[in-house]
Amino acid sequence: MIKIVLNGCCGKMGKVITECASKFNDLQIVAGIDKFPYETSYPIFETPEDLNLDYDVLLDFSRAGALKGLLNLTEKTKKPLVICSTGFSDEDLALIEEKSKTLPLFRSANMSLGINLINSLLRKVTPLLYGNYDIEIIEKHHNQKVDSPSGTAVLLADTIKESINDETKFVYGRSGASKREENEIGIHAIRGGSIVGDHDVIFAGVGEVIELSHKAISREVFAIGALKACEYMGNISIPGLYTMDDVIGITK
């Protein structure tokens, strides 16, 4: 049995993860970390420093501001940390990269199987289409999401950029009077209502448009992905920065 400590257990995703965990025979949430606790089947600690029990995997589905405290705890326990939060700064990402040299860390901007398959497809199709097709990314989320563009949109944009043997640049939204340049990758964010998460990658050519689209119907898809990452990382002790590609067996 893999024992999980869930940071952000009282948030929207934390509650969904707690519910979904009961469907996994090899996983058990033994404790949570949250500043605003509510009644659960497991004990809740207000900060990582307060945690006083043993665990196998630390799962974070909260906000970027929790990162340093979680890394401090991970350095003490040497147990795997699964990072599912988004909104990290370049400094945060560099810190994760540095700490992964000595700790087993997992990070993904999106935990769904579908998004990660699309991300894998982008590595293959982008080199074939770039130059003849303009590339734009549109992401839509609920009106309570605080980071923009979404971590998933950034993930997809980075994959596209890395797949192109050219100097490309990101353009966030469009306004004013200016013509689109060939080497631009447009990224656009929409916020409204209760949209769980929609992502469209558009390759617009002459006479045709190719789209890769993903629509999340329920938060459960992210919860299941996070728990599968815990299953995978529960058997990992070697330092490194692991991703959903490792969990689902995608070869780059």
UniProtKB/Swiss-Prot annotation:
Function of the protein: Catalyzes the conversion of 4-hydroxy-tetrahydrodipicolinate (HTPA) to tetrahydrodipicolinate.
Protein name (record): 4-hydroxy-tetrahydrodipicolinate reductase
Record Pfam families: DapB_C (PF05173), DapB_N (PF01113)
Amino-acid positions noted as binding (S)-2,3,4,5-tetrahydrodipicolinate in the UniProt annotation, renumbered to this chain: 142, 151-152
Any one annotated GO CC term: cytosol
Entry's Gene Ontology molecular function annotations: 4-hydroxy-tetrahydrodipicolinate reductase; NAD binding; NADP binding; oxidoreductase activity, acting on CH or CH2 groups, NAD or NADP as acceptor
Gene giving rise to this polypeptide: dapB
Entry keyword NADP: yes
Protein residues bound to NAD(+): 8-13, 84-86, 108-111
Catalytic activity: (S)-2,3,4,5-tetrahydrodipicolinate + NAD(+) + H2O = (2S,4S)-4-hydroxy-2,3,4,5-tetrahydrodipicolinate + NADH + H(+); (S)-2,3,4,5-tetrahydrodipicolinate + NADP(+) + H2O = (2S,4S)-4-hydroxy-2,3,4,5-tetrahydrodipicolinate + NADPH + H(+)
Active site: 141, 145
Pathway(s) per entry: Amino-acid biosynthesis; L-lysine biosynthesis via DAP pathway; (S)-tetrahydrodipicolinate from L-aspartate: step 4/4
The keyword S-adenosyl-L-methionine belongs to this UniProt entry's keyword annotation: no
GO biological process, one term: diaminopimelate biosynthetic process
Enzyme superclass (EC): oxidoreductase
Location(s), subcellular: Cytoplasm
Family annotation (CDD domains): DHDPR_N
Family the entry assigns: Belongs to the DapB family.
Xref: NCBIfam families: dapB
Signal peptide: none
HAMAP family: DapB
